[in-house]
């Protein structure tokens, strides 16, 4: 069977990431699937001109840079056949123009997609697969009760990427089991 481990951590804190790594490395020698699902939405209704520097910095730290630090820290537990899932958002899509929705959030998700491409280039020679995925607007704490998607529907593509997707598919952005030009 499949065994999972949930490691809560504050991805805005290097100490918290290192503590989570210590817990994981004490329990397992290898991670098959690493899911980066951290995210904050702090700037709804703002513009890039009027969002505070603190909110912009915190959003980038949590939504993108923290996820990068998790990958870098957990790399010793990843090996050939391991998969990394970066939970992103359609807000990070810049094809056809940038989103007017929550600019700090959108920037952070565009950065996550770009990091995914860079990491794929770096990790492919090691046999590690990485992709970013938009689960859509999901009924979670962030999405709220009015969101259009169930948690199960939002998890469909991340689970496919983690378990069934061909290993040749790496460095891409996905939504509803389809590669998205972002």
Question: How would you name each of these model-derived features?
Answer:
Residues 71-72, 117:
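A short, exposed helix-loop element centered on a Lys and neighboring polar residues
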């Amino acid at each position: 069977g499949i065994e999972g481990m949930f490691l809560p951590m504050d991805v805005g804190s290097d100490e918290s990431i290192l503590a989570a790594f210590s817990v994981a490395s004490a329990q397992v020698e290898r991670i098959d699937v690493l899911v980066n699902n951290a995210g904050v939405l702090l700037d709804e209704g703002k513009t890039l001109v009027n969002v505070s520097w603190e909110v912009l910095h915190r959003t980038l730290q949590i939504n993108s840079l923290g996820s990068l630090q998790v990958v870098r820290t957990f790399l010793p537990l990843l090996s050939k056949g391991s998969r990394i899932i970066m939970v992103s958002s359609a807000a990070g899509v810049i094809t056809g123009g940038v989103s007017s929705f929550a600019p700090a959030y959108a920037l952070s998700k565009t950065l996550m997609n770009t990091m995914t491409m860079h990491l794929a280039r770096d990790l492919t020679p090691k046999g590690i697969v990485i992709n970013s995925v938009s689960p859509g607007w999901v009924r979670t704490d962030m999405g709220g009760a009015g969101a259009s998607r169930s948690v199960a529907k939002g998890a469909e593509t991340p689970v496919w990427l983690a378990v069934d997707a061909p290993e040749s598919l790496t460095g891409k952005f996905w939504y509803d089991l389809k590669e998205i030009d972002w």
